Amino acid sequence: LHKVFIMEALECLKRIEKESIQTIYIDPPYNTKSSNFEYEDAHADYEKWIEEHLILAKAALKQSGCIFISIDDNKMAEVKIIANEIFGTRNFLGTFITKQATRSNAKHINITHEYVLSYAKNKAFAPGFKILRTLLPIYAKPLKDLMRTIKNVFKQKGQAQAQLILKEQIKELSQKEHFNFLKNYNLVDEKGEIYFAKDLSTPSHPRSVAIQEINLFLEPLKSRGWSSDEKLKELHYQNRLIFKNNRPYEKYYLKESQDNCLSVLDFYSRQGTKDLEKLGLKGLFKTPKPVGLIKYLLLCSTPKNSIILDFFCRQRDNSASGYRS
């Protein structure tokens, strides 16, 4: 469900119920040279203006909520100082860096990036910022190609041949930067899916296991415990329990592999313009952010069916292109 309210951002924030929003994304205007905004472009006016909005934004966020602030070098320093004061440096999550088109008219340094500052309302309750590797731009195509190749070999030549091809492909891919983790995913299951065998021992006191319901009996290890009986039964009924040398392991699938969100992103600003063109909205906004960027931030931080707010979308950006994702 999407709703757009046409009103001044500050008035909108005052009407929002406290602690009702999971995620806020904003691309605040600056250096507008326009009379349409409620501040002039002097530093003091802008700082007071952004501070008023961020104070109300913090109040609107749930305890587990996060805010993302798109900004460039023009106002990066001022906005970060203000955000640190309002949210606290302890709740600063990090800075995403997005690439921009190369500019040839710079007098000194060619600036080819912008920033997205990220803060939690309360870092102790913030999401883990984990994301499926198949959704990360750096991994998506290589991993999907690998899974497709192995599935095809499995269908045509069987599990043993798929296993051999997988080892060859992993040897090559794992030499690339960021792909070393693939060395673990060296097995193919009875459906042609890639997985690795995850150890089910835990750093706890040794114990034996006797679960008659699934006919599972394990001797205690010398210095480690076993996963809980509930965990072992769950894996059994999900057909994710396998054994090597009479020891149980979990099938951990490549398609479910996660990683922390990466901070340097390959979402170019010009893609936002193309996204609007696809919607028949060419020229509607001067600097729209790409759908991929907004989607990435939401996937990192926002559970399904959450309420998301952008209280500057009419002024700059992406109610049309971003939140369809």
Which role does the model predict for each range below?
Residues 319-325:
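Conserved SAM-binding loop of SAM-dependent methyltransferases across substrates and taxa
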Residues 1-307:
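Class I S-adenosyl-L-methionine
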Residues 32, 317-318:
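Ser/Thr-centric signal marking residues that sit
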